[in-house]
Each structure stands twice: as structure tokens, then as C-alpha cells.
């Protein structure tokens, strides 16, 4: 019998608290403090519930440790904090490696899985070594300890022992279903176009109409209506770095001069036979607001404008009104962006410090989860896609999540790197409908490679979107994209990767009836491109 599984439903062997006033050496044995906080670990419905009680000393993190024998483990694969940034990779047992939310451990025969259920109140990260498993639960508010007034469940721990007869990818998918009891899934397939990666914000009502006509030509054989998604570039305030500093926030009740009315644009899209979609950034504005509504920290990548504090009830009301207004314009899909960055920055791990949100009784994850639920409630029956959002919080709230990094209409290497997010395909239709981002069709990128990317999305049943310069496709390319969109409109072919284990970019896929696909992501540069920039 392989030594590669520890039952996390057993009571942890140890707990350790990091308080707001803990010393830097709080993990050193000679710095251990007598526990002054209460925590419970109870097993209900095959999950270990971690309940944290109010503490006189605000708590920042809780460390739980299960000791056991994992000496036969060969490889581990963790998830990403929010969207993947080429960081979802198989590796050998690496004890200091942080694995957000959950991880898989392969022992050469079976895949064992360890994690927490979606919707956790704390930011959860695992570490694994041959002698045990460590779980860190980050319950900070901003960079400070949480000041919770009542006991609350900070995470629900789950695990799954694999079987040697299972395909590892299937084991991972089953575990994702175990982590998310009530996924929200789209009623119809999400496919069509998003105009970001060919227009990069240079759009108008007229360009959207031209694009919609081209979309309907590409989707001539589709069995459902496609989406025409209007991305960044419609709002009244938008500046590029070459002008007044980069800004792409609100207010959202006004358009720029290139659009007369976003409701009229949505209606015109519908009249052409497509569904309408639109993008917005809910937590950034140029509006003057009272100081308590401002976020405690400014996003360094957006030096202009104001970031809003989503823990404040007035901010939630503003976001709700904006979302409901956009839905009232007739948009069938709403994509909201940047909420994780506008609240916590690019990484949750390096944000310690004396800063906090307006409501100090909530953790960072509770604040964001409440924001996502507010947006979904206001969107009504519209499909919502989260971008730059926390995937483990979006699950069970939104129908889709942008799971990977940006693709590109400027060079394919960025798109190839974004293929790493397909390592998250076990989450597809278990958490939500995975959105790998857009294939791009411009004069600067290879159409064949992007058709492969789009087909990969379609055959697996993932969100299938492209950014297509109107009129750019050759006849052969048009014929192929029609076939791809037809497959996407039917919900895909049920294709699964056959090279998920041990890789970080998958190439080989097979359908249940034995049809095989092999995508060569490296032929564009005869390998990989090493020297490039996002803008070239």
C-alpha cells in the first residue's frame, strides 16, 4: 500500500495562531504562546468545519497541521489564488511551496486530493511534505487581524482518496464536484466574440454592429445564439498610458462619444440575432465619494481615479445599482473585472501591514464573496463572468470565471502561456463554466494557432470566445470557425486531456467516442518565444 494519503477529517494534530501583535518569530518553538483563542474542528457531512471564535487579540492566520506518512508521493499540483498566471504546474514534493485552496498528490498509481470547500471565509493555502500536510487559513481584514464579533466557520476541509483504476483527471474532476456542492452553470453554452483583443478599447456603436454582422456569419451553423460582448472602451472615462495615465473605471451611467446609448446598442445586437454582453469595473470611479467609501489602498497599476471599499454598505449599494442598470439596458451577460486587484492588490501573500477595510468584522474573503453575491443578485437572470476574481469564491455564485491570464492579439506566445489555465479544466462544470479567455484574430498573430485555441475550448465544453477583426478570415478559416462554433453551441464534445498528468500545458485531447486532437502550441516559433513584451 502506498503511503500518500492522510485523512484530513481526523482532528488536526496541532493549531497555531498568528495574532495582529505576534512577533516575527511566532512559528519558532521558543516563541509559541499559550493559546488565548478558541477554535473548533468538527466533522459534519464529510467535511471538517473550522470554527473561529472572537478573540481579544485580533487573529490574522490560523495554521493547522496533520502529521502522517506521504513518503510515496511523487508529484503535487495546486490551484491558483485567483486567475492562473502560468503558475499551475506539477512539481515534486516541495515543502515550502504554497498551494492555494487545494492540491492533488500523485503516487504513481492514484491521485489523492486535499482541499477546502468553495466559498471559504478565509484564504486557504496548503503545504505538503513527506511527514504531513499544513493548512494556513488567512482571516485578515486588509493587512490586520479580523475583529469578528461572533463565531464563524472559516473553512470546511475535505479530502478524497483516489483509486488506481481511475484516470487522474477524472479523480480531480470528482474532487472539484466534492468541493462545490451547488455550482451555478449557464443554461446555454457561452460562445461568440469579445472585442478586446483586436480593438483594445477602440470601439464604437458602428464597429460593434459591423462585428455583430461578422459574428452571425461565423455562427451561421450554430444551434444556439452567440454572444457579442462589448469589452472595455464604451464608458465615458477611459485613458491610455500615452495620454493622462491609464484609467478604465466608471462612472458607468454615461457612454463616451462613440456610443449614443448602450441600451440601443444592446437592442441592435439582439435585432441581428445575437445575445449582448458587456464589461465593467465596479470598484473604480472618478466620482467624488466620502472618505469611508474609498478603499484603504490604491491600486498601483491604476494611479488615477478612486478605488471603492466593498466592505462599506453604501459601496455595495452603488455596485448593485450599476449592475442592475446595466441589466436594465438589456444585456444578457455581464463581465465584471479587477475586484481582487482593486481590493487586495496582485497577491494576497504580501499585503501585511497596518491597513484595514471599513468593516473590520469581516475577512477579506467574506468581503469579496459578499461583493460577488451583490453583483449576481443585481444581475438577475443575466450570465455573470468574473475576471480578476477569486475562483474559489466565484464558484456557486457566478456561472463563469476567467480562469487564466490574458491572451493576445499581438503575439501568440502570450496566448500559449495562457493555455496553462486549461490545467484547471477539472473545475469545468464542477465549479462553473471555465473561461480560458479569447482566441485572437489580427494581422499580428497566426490564425491557425488561434483556431486551435478556440477549438480546444469548444471540444471541452469550456467558454468559447474569440476576438476577431471583422473581415480578416480567409474562406478556409471561416469554414473552420463555423464548425468550431457549431460544436461550442452544442456544449462541446466532452473531450478530456490525455496528457494532464505531469504537464503544465496540455496538447492531447480525446472525446468519449475516441476522436483525438493534438494541438502543437509550439509551431509558431519553432519552440517558445523567449523575448517579448505585452505590447509588441
Question: Where in the sequence are the language-model features?
Answer:
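Aromatic- and carboxylate-enriched substrate-binding clefts and catalytic-loop regions
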Residues: 102, 224-443, 449, 477
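Short helix/loop capping segments that flank catalytic or ligand/cofactor-binding pockets
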Residues: 201-202, 238, 467-469
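Short, flexible loop/turn elements at secondary-structure junctions
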Residues: 54-56, 68, 120, 139-141, ...
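Surface-exposed beta-strand-to-loop junctions
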Residues: 190-192, 350, 457
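A generic structural motif
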Residues: 77-80, 222-232, 492-503, 536
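Active-site-proximal substrate-binding groove within the catalytic cores of carbohydrate-active enzymes
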Residues: 138-140, 147-156, 194, 361-536
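Surface-exposed flexible segments
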Residues: 25-29, 203-207, 342, 470-482
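Carbohydrate-recognition beta-sandwich/jelly-roll modules
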Residues: 2-227, 333
Amino acid at each position: 500500500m502506498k503511503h500518500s494519503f492522510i485523512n484530513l477529517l481526523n482532528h488536526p494534530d496541532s493549531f497555531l495562531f498568528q495574532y495582529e501583535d505576534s512577533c516575527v518569530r511566532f512559528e519558532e518553538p521558543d516563541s509559541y504562546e499559550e493559546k488565548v483563542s478558541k477554535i473548533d474542528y468538527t466533522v459534519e457531512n464529510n467535511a471538517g468545519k473550522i470554527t473561529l471564535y472572537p478573540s481579544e487579540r485580533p487573529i490574522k492566520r490560523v495554521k493547522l497541521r496533520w502529521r502522517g506518512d506521504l513518503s510515496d508521493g511523487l508529484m503535487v499540483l495546486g490551484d491558483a489564488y485567483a486567475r492562473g498566471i502560468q503558475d499551475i504546474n506539477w512539481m515534486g514534493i516541495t515543502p515550502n511551496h504554497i498551494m492555494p485552496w487545494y492540491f492533488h498528490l500523485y503516487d504513481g498509481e492514484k491521485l489523492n486530493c486535499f482541499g477546502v470547500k468553495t466559498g471559504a471565509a478565509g484564504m486557504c493555502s496548503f503545504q505538503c511534505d513527506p511527514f504531513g500536510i499544513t493548512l494556513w487559513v488567512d482571516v485578515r481584514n486588509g493587512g490586520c487581524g479580523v475583529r469578528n464579533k461572533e463565531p464563524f466557520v472559516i473553512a470546511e476541509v475535505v479530502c478524497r482518496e483516489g483509486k488506481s483504476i481511475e484516470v487522474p483527471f477524472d479523480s480531480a474532476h470528482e474532487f472539484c464536484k466534492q468541493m462545490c456542492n451547488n455550482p451555478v452553470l449557464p443554461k446555454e453554452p457561452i460562445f461568440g466574440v469579445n472585442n478586446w483583443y483586436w480593438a483594445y478599447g477602440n470601439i464604437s456603436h458602428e464597429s460593434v454592429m459591423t462585428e455583430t454582422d461578422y459574428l452571425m456569419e461565423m455562427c451561421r451553423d450554430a444551434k444556439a445564439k452567440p454572444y457579442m460582448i462589448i469589452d472595455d472602451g464604451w464608458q465615458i472615462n477611459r485613458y491610455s498610458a500615452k495620454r493622462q495615465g491609464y484609467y478604465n473605471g466608471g462612472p458607468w451611467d454615461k457612454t463616451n462619444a462613440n456610443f449614443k446609448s448602450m441600451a440601443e446598442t444592446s437592442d441592435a445586437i439582439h435585432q441581428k440575432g445575437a445575445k449582448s454582453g458587456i464589461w465593467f469595473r465596479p470598484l473604480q470611479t472618478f466620482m467624488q465619494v466620502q472618505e469611508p467609501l474609498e478603499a484603504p489602498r490604491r491600486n498601483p497599476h491604476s494611479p488615477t481615479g478612486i478605488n471603492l471599499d466593498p466592505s462599506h454598505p453604501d459601496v455595495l449599494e452603488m455596485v448593485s445599482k450599476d449592475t442592475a442598470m446595466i441589466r436594465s439596458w438589456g444585456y444578457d451577460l455581464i463581465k465584471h473585472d479587477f475586484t481582487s486587484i482593486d481590493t487586495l492588490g496582485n497577491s494576497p501573500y504580501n499585503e501585511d501591514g497596518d491597513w484595514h477595510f471599513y468593516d473590520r468584522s469581516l475577512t477579506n474573503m467574506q468581503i469579496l464573496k459578499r461583493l460577488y453575491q451583490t453583483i449576481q443578485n443585481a444581475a438577475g437572470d443575466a450570465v455573470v463572468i468574473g475576471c480578476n476574481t477569486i475562483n474559489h469564491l466565484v464558484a456557486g455564485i457566478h456561472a463563469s470565471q476567467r480562469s487564466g491570464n490574458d491572451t493576445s492579439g499581438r503575439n501568440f506566445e502570450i496566448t500559449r502561456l495562457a493555455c496553462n489555465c486549461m490545467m484547471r479544466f477539472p473545475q469545468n462544470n464542477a465549479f462553473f463554466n471555465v473561461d480560458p479567455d479569447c482566441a485572437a484574430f489580427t494581422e499580428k498573430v497566426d490564425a491557425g494557432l488561434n483556431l486551435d485555441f478556440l477549438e480546444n475550448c469548444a471540444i471541452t465544453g469550456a467558454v468559447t470566445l474569440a476576438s476577431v477583426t471583422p473581415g480578416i478570415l480567409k474562406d478556409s478559416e471561416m469554414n473552420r470557425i463555423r464548425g468550431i462554433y457549431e460544436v461550442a453551441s452544442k456544449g462541446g464534445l466532452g473531450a478530456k486531456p490525455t496528457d494532464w498528468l505531469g504537464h503544465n500545458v496540455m496538447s492531447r485531447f480525446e472525446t468519449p467516442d475516441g476522436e483525438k486532437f493534438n494541438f502543437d502550441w509550439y509551431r509558431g516559433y519553432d519552440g517558445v518565444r523567449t523575448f517579448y513584451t505585452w505590447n509588441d
